[in-house]
Amino acid sequence: MASLSLQHINKTYPNGFEAVKDFNLEIEDKEFIIFVGPSGCGKSTTLRMIAGLEEISGGTLKIGDKVMNDVEPKDRDIAMVFQNYALYPHMTVYDNMAFGLKLRKVPKDQIDKAVREAARILDLEKLLDRKPKALSGGQRQRVAMGRAIVRNPKVFLMDEPLSNLDAKLRVQMRIEISKIHQRLGATIIYVTHDQTEAMTLGTRIVVMKDGVVQQVDTPQNLYQKPGNLFVAGFMGSPQMNFLDAVISEKGGNLIAKVGDHELAIPAAKAKALKDGGYVGKTVVLGIRPEDIHDSQMFIEASPSAPMTSVVKVYELLGAEVFLYFDVNGTQVTARVDPRTTAKTGDPIKFAFDMEKSHFFDKETELTICN
């Protein structure tokens, strides 16, 4: 396997559109890197530049110690898995998996060994004689991965490989891909717009927007310590709630005023806000759905007075309940205990866990404190 280095990578099309802008990333050997972001953010374009399917307009791409900018795709020692499987319909599973090795004139006994080992890893041993039309979507995707595995490449590139599968199969295939990474110790770069895939699969995640890298970090850090408003809103489902808040001083302490509600700000966050010159200014307060509580015990322990609203929508998802209600004219989502007594149309009393709150600069959208 191999490390990768992307230094000041740019992609500009002939019409002047900049798809990727000054992309910098060092990928260690055996890492599982996720490129995530909304459609059109440049993640697939970056992957295709690594593969050699798109020309690099500027910057340097290295795999190991070798500069790859002008190396043909077939000579880069990478394998790519696409979302549409790209299987040959007239070939069996065995022949689809063996095809790339046959083109390279690998000896038959080595091909057979590689195919059967990949089939064992992917639980395809009983399907080797079938043709793609006789396979389910999940089985076809496993064959596409098997075709990549038999080549034993330095780097695996995966471009939204699960997007054509239903929800249940996506969960199963996420587990399969994690197992493959553990078994092979492979370097994997994986593109998705699904932040659940990103959070569950990646050792590190690259969040992109409009061709620009917003933040690179572990899933846990991206969730708990987002670097800006976009990352905070993109990572997490349901997304973080955002409310305008005026930072004020009261009795020697800082509070966040959200409409008529006064929320006590914990000391460390208060210091960051004061040091940043935000007293008297409007900032964006971020609070995740799971950090809004309607339990009487939490409300009584909260240093701030309870907030009130009316439940607009109640959603039961088995192990959890989502409540939707307004705070100062903005819709807020709370993830609460399923034993809650609140229902649609009911008045609700609740409190924010301000220890878990986030504050963002309203102009720059950068994080002030997490």
Predicted features and spans:
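Short coil-to-beta microelement around the adenine-binding A-loop and adjacent beta1/P-loop entry
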Residues: 16-18
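The feature captures the beta-strand-to-loop junction immediately N-terminal to the Walker
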Residues: 36-38
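Helix-to-loop junction immediately C-terminal to a conserved catalytic motif
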Residues: 51
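Conserved coupling/switch loops of ABC nucleotide-binding domains, chiefly the family-specific signature
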Residues: 57-60, 110, 210, 357
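Conserved ABC transporter NBD signature motif
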Residues: 59-67
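ABC ATPase nucleotide-binding domains
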Residues: 73-230, 234
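Glycine/charge-rich catalytic "coupling/switch" loops of P-loop NTPases
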Residues: 253-311, 331, 341-370
